[in-house]
Amino acid sequence: PQRQIKILMITTPNLNRVFIRKLQKVCRHLNFANGQVLIQDYNESFYYYALSQQPETFLHDVVLFDYTESDMMSCCLHRNLHTTPQVITLEQKNNGKLLDQKDEQFKNIAEQIIAGQVVSSVYLIGDGFDGDWMKTSLQYLCHTRKVFLGKNLYSKGACYAGFIKDEKRDWPFVYIGDNELKLNLYLKVLIRNEMQFFTLITAGESWFDAVGECEVILDGTPEIEVWIQRPESREAHVELLELTDMVERERRTTRLRITAVPESDCKVKITIRDLGFGEIA
């Protein structure tokens, strides 16, 4: 029964908005609560799996070779050690089919992918790696690197993701993929007489699911400052939103609800609603 399920993780090769909406509709029909079902693609599952292993396995870059289908796919995980949190990027490539002399072909592909990089570990997944055909290619991969062979990496990565997201475990990484938000949005607000930044949107979250909302009391001029920061940068720029056609009231008697809803991975729609006079519920 779904009431016994704390988090349901779903991982799939690719995501799009139509698929997400249909899946969310099915989950609502099955009485899953909002936030109980989390969806991610295979790339994100690889990211969570690789960085949930022992630190020495991702001291440098990590490479995945996926031979599940007829084509040999590769994915390289890179960490930016100069950002906080560390920004993770994945470089994916379709290397085509392995025909005759598979061992030599795969060795050539591996050499091209790894060239110029320091790689700590390599993961080999998919039925295509079955059999005893890897000889020189495996010897090359195992030189100064850890190599792992298996078939359930994506499902395990989804489980790691569910644990990390649900338990709010310390996670010093942020993954910026095709479906992840490429910006942070903040509001500068006064909380208990202390000026703080309130996070509306967080980079690295899936733009399909992310939403930010808060209620504030307007103090002073009718305008809102939105601070926008790219995850790879320590600098932020400010967008000033002027609130026009508002009812004039005395200072600190205007209550606003601010809602941020992503429209893509790099575009966010902000709606500001005048709630009138009163206390914040």
Residue ranges, per PLM feature:
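Conserved phosphate-binding loops in N-terminal lobes of ATP-dependent enzymes
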Residues: 1-18, 93-107, 112-119
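Glycine-rich phosphate-binding/hydrolytic loop that grips phosphoryl groups
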Residues: 38-55, 147-190
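Nucleotide/phosphate-binding catalytic cleft detector across ATP-hydrolyzing
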Residues: 1-62, 192-262, 271-281
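A short acidic Gly-Thr/Ser loop motif
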Residues: 56-73, 78-80, 126-129, 176-182, ...
